[in-house]
């Protein structure tokens, strides 16, 4: 594991996204709460948050980070859903692996819960879209832009 003890604490934010292709009928079943395993998107959000919190146990050389925020957002479209994970910490190293793990596990949960009704699902385009680092002092003087909520789709 890399030694980060000489690095100063800073506010770190990472945003990861991915897509899951779903049949239109599957999306209808999800929206009507007709999937046998339960509320698909609520379960996926919780699974993604839990997974982000467990990243250091899943990826051997990742540092254990004190996460101050993990948010999973799911936006549907005609052919599936785009899942976004926002992770935030005040630490000496980045939080991108937590965001990537969160978004991936959220999509795998959707896959698991819908596999009985949709044999053509496909997970794709998992990527890091934002990684920021702000000085810790920015939190106290109002300069920290990472505090805003990320709801709009990012390019």
Report residues per predicted region.
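C-terminal binding/interaction regions
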Residues: 1-41, 46-61, 68-150
């Amino acid at each position: 594991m890399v030694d980060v003890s000489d690095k100063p604490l800073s506010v770190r934010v990472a945003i990861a996204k991915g897509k899951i292709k779903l049949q239109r009928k599957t999306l209808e079943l999800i929206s009507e709460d007709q999937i046998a395993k339960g509320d698909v998107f609520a379960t996926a959000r919780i699974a993604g948050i839990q997974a982000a919190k467990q990243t250091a146990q899943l990826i051997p050389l990742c540092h254990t980070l004190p996460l101050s925020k993990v948010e999973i957002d799911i936006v549907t479209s005609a052919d599936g859903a785009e899942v976004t994970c926002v992770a935030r910490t005040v630490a000496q190293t980045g939080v991108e692996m937590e965001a990537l793990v969160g978004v991936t596990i959220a999509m795998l949960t959707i896959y698991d819960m819908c596999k009985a009704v949709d044999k053509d699902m496909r997970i794709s385009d998992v990527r890091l879209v934002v990684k920021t680092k702000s000085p810790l002092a920015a939190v106290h003087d109002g300069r920290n832009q990472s505090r805003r909520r990320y709801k709009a789709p990012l390019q």
